Amino acid sequence: MPAKEVAVCSNSFNGTIGETIIFKNNHSSAVDITQNGTATWPFATPPATPSPCVPAKSGNTEGTLSVTLLSTPGTYTYNTVGCPQIADVNPKTVIIS
């Protein structure tokens, strides 16, 4: 089964435990994914430190970053830095079931 693709600047998404997600960035600036304060980091990989980065779009090619969701169901939050102002709403939410 191919990995689910999610726009890195979207406000929320649903996933399943241990699922691989491909964050896609179609903007001209890179987007960092950061921990929401002391909230549980929703990704098994990569770690929260250093903050993972989804590269900027290059030509017609979107930047991508592969992440793996935790194996514990729940609602988790994280932040992004670098999304266009209209999409730069934090925290973002992922519901893992």
Each model region followed by its residue ranges:
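N-terminal targeting/disorder module
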Residues: 4-6, 46, 51, 86
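Asparagine-centered strand-capping/turn motif at beta-strand->loop junctions
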Residues: 24-27
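Extracellular/periplasmic metallocenter environments
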Residues: 52-97
